Regions:
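Conserved PLP-enzyme active-site core in the AAT-like
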Residues: 1-22, 26, 53-67, 72-231
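A glycine-/small-polar-enriched, mobile loop at the entrance of the PLP active site in fold-type I
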Residues: 13-51
Length: 231
């Protein structure tokens, strides 16, 4: 009997793909075995995260990496890092961001349920662009000049949701950010496969990239990796 049936839950046929609300993707057997082995020992979590950071950096081409409880948690941590930096006092005050740069620019057509993670960290999302392309009223989306025009002394970062149809292209956004010395956070939760995307977003200039561990990476559902700059 299925373990789910013992608690009255009915297994389903998932024809959509690794969606979080449908319990993500199926975990690889070797991952399950590794979790069983790991569960038999205690380790220093700081040492484990440092070792994981090296593994993630090697796979993504980033300077460092971090394991969190999902891509959404990674986005919250990324937003928090962009606002508080390495200041422990500011870290302790979050989500109270008074006195900090706390605005994060986001393309209006990329808004979604998961950007709540950005707001949960204490950030205010500043929307730019017109989603004409999705309403059928035109072909216009956000343009580079609109992102640049929204930058102010309160801007902490630019948030970009990776998608095949995303406009403007990520390199355009990262070029704008670099001119203004701002970090770019990329939500790439569902952008695997292809495997090349593990390194693509860092190569295109992103500073922090979040991937889901519970989709096609084949890890546990409540997992995610954040990769990017050490600082």
């Amino acid at each position: 009997m299925s373990i789910y049936k013992t608690i009255g839950v009915t297994p389903i046929i998932n024809a959509k793909g690794p969606a979080t609300r449908l319990s993500g993707g199926l975990m690889r057997p070797e991952v399950a075995e590794a979790m069983v082995q790991a569960s038999q020992h205690c380790v220093d979590m700081a040492e484990l995260q440092a070792a994981a950071s090296q593994q993630i950096a090697g796979a993504t081409g980033a300077e460092a990496g971090y394991v969190a409880s999902g891509a959404s948690a990674c986005l919250l941590l990324a937003a928090a890092a962009c606002m508080a930096g390495l200041d422990p006092g500011r870290m302790a005050r979050l989500p109270d961001t008074r006195g900090m740069k706390n605005e994060i620019i986001m393309i209006r057509s990329q808004r979604n349920f998961y950007d709540h993670a950005i707001r949960a960290a204490g950030a205010t999302i500043i929307e730019v662009g017109l989603p004409d392309r999705y309403s059928g009223a035109g072909v216009r989306d956000a343009e580079g000049w609109e992102i640049e025009d929204a930058i102010s002394e309160r801007t902490a970062a630019i948030f970009y949701v990776a998608d095949a149809a995303a406009q403007p292209p990520l390199p355009v956004v990262t070029a704008i950010a670099k001119r203004h010395k701002l970090p770019v956070i990329v939500d790439a939760a569902a952008q695997l496969p292809p495997q090349s995307n593990l390194k693509r977003f860092i190569a295109e200039g992103a500073d922090l990239v979040a991937f889901s561990g519970g989709k096609l990476l084949g890890g546990p559902q409540a997992s995610g990796i954040l990769c990017g700059r050490k600082d």
